[in-house]
Design a protein with these regions (language model features):
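Selective detector of the "anchor" transmembrane alpha-helix that sits immediately C-terminal
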Residues: 187-196
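Extracytoplasmic ligand-binding sensor domains of the Cache superfamily
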Residues: 74-111
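Juxtamembrane amphipathic/coiled-coil helical coupling segments that flank
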Residues: 27-44, 62-69, 94, 98, ...
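Generic structural concept
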Residues: 48-58, 62, 81, 85-88, ...
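Short, Lys/Arg-rich N-terminal segment immediately upstream of the first membrane anchor
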Residues: 1-7
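Amphipathic alpha-helical segments and their boundaries
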Residues: 8, 12-61, 74, 102-117, ...
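Long, amphipathic, charge-rich alpha-helical segments that form helical bundles/coiled-coils
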Residues: 109-131
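Juxtamembrane segments flanking the first transmembrane helix
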Residues: 5, 50-52, 56, 89, ...
Length: 196
């Protein structure tokens, strides 16, 4: 009688242990996937959105610099200048927000953006002096040469920054999919062992 009882209880206990182990692994894997999903949503996507705002404001700023050249009258110049100051303030805010999430993989692209942004501000200050002293020929030359080059470099730096963020998000997504595949494989193996 004891041997029949043992023959029945050992497989039942083994199945119970496998079921408990499978449940624990499933919970741990689900938690890992959830954490990775939260990381993607709260960090990478927010950062990509922030880079988008930074890009949009930077493009508006570069367009406004050209508007400053053709602004006629003190009121029009003041309006454009106020808009430029507002955009610079926005960009500074976006840069501070971005710096909060910056990691070592993004530092090169961000450093490049900051460098070209600084060059743009320097070139714009010169342009502003030319316009304010009615040196329209010099202002036009600067705008059509140096400022164009800096704006193109700035746009390229923003593209690199965006690509860096998208690559980081893609990497995180691949990690999440790998965790999901591992969870499915582990669950499948445990199921086969339990049935077998």
């Amino acid at each position: 009688m004891n041997s029949v009882k043992n023959k029945i209880m050992i497989p039942v206990l083994l199945l119970a242990v496998i079921a408990v182990a499978t449940s624990i692994l499933s919970i741990m894997n689900a938690d890992s996937i959830s954490k990775k999903g939260d990381d993607i949503a709260n960090n990478y996507l927010v950062t990509i959105e922030n880079v988008g705002y930074l890009s949009e404001s930077t493009q508006k700023l570069t367009r406004s610099a050209y508007s400053y050249i053709v602004a006629e009258g003190d009121a029009a110049k003041k309006s454009v200048k106020d808009n430029i100051e507002s955009l610079k303030s926005e960009i500074d805010g976006y840069m501070k927000d971005y710096e909060q999430t910056l990691d070592e993989n993004e530092e090169t692209a961000y450093s490049s953006y900051k460098n070209y942004y600084s060059q743009f501000l320097t070139q714009f200050a010169v342009l502003e002096k030319y316009v304010d002293t009615n040196q329209t020929v010099n202002a036009s030359k600067l705008a059509n040469n140096n400022l164009v080059d800096v704006c193109n470099s700035l746009e390229s730096a923003l593209d690199n920054l965006t690509n860096s963020e998208v690559e980081a998000a893609d990497h995180a997504m691949r990690q999440m999919h790998a965790l999901s595949a591992f969870a499915k494989t582990t669950g499948g193996v445990c199921l086969v062992v339990a049935i077998g």
